[in-house]
Design a protein with these regions (language model features):
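Helix-turn-helix
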Residues: 12, 16, 20-54, 58-59
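Hydrophobic alpha-helical connector segments
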Residues: 69-103, 149-156
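C-terminal peripheral helix-coil segments that are non-catalytic and often amphipathic
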Residues: 93, 97, 127-140, 158-200
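Conserved hydrophobic residue
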Residues: 26-27, 114, 143
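Amphipathic alpha-helical packing segments from all-alpha helical-bundle domains
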Residues: 65-73, 114-140, 151, 185
Length: 200
């Protein structure tokens, strides 16, 4: 099957690996379990991805590509950054719908060297693009120039991901888990209003 449809085989491996990594982390994930879930010989995993670490890196790389595409479709280029700013509530919904990816980020933070993040160059370019968008918005007078652009981007990331990374605190404060549709709606509305207040 792998030779007839390698892309389908890769897709099954990646889907199984996402479940395994998000549940058990990088160290706890087992190649045998991933292969069994994907219904492939584990040799195919090594053939396509080289190693368990290579598989983890590929999952993050593909997810980053998806988010980069979403950024550009929302207008994520200098001079058209208003669309990205307005997409903040949409990001809350997207994060809530993709809890496994958020768990991957948490496992990465717990198990890897923060000085050497996975796919660092690609991800750094992604956040540099977001920071450039903020600066363009500041030049256009839509975001106050007094704010550091990099801190603005980091704060947006924390505001969106925070409830998913700390679900127990979210539940204690609001009485809702962060994937609850009611919480997602309230959070998206709150962040949209907050951003509008901060913008000039």
């Amino acid at each position: 099957m792998a030779t007839r449809d390698p892309e389908a085989t890769k897709a099954r491996i990646l889907a199984a690996a996402l479940r395994e990594f998000s549940a058990k982390g990088i160290a706890g994930a087992r190649v045998d379990a991933i292969a069994a879930s994907a219904k492939v010989n584990k040799r195919m995993l090594y053939y396509y991805f080289g190693s368990k670490d290579g598989l983890f890196q590929e999952i993050l790389r593909r997810r980053l590509h998806e988010r980069t595409a979403a950024l550009h479709s929302a207008g994520g280029t200098a001079g058209s950054g208003a669309a990205v700013r307005q997409a903040m509530p949409e990001r809350v919904t997207r994060v809530a719908d993709d809890a496994e990816y958020t768990r991957l980020l948490l496992w990465e933070a717990l198990e890897t060297d923060p000085q050497q993040p996975v796919n660092a160059a690609i991800r750094r370019d992604f956040f540099r693009t977001l920071t450039d968008v903020v600066r363009a918005e500041q030049d256009a007078g839509r975001i106050p120039a007094e704010f550091d652009a990099a801190q603005w981007v980091l704060s947006e990331v924390c505001l969106v991901l925070g409830p998913m990374l700390l679900p127990q605190i979210t539940q204690l404060v609001t009485g809702l888990v962060p994937t609850d549709p009611e919480f997602v709606a309230v959070r998206a509305d709150f962040l949209g209003r907050l951003e509008a207040r901060l913008a000039t």
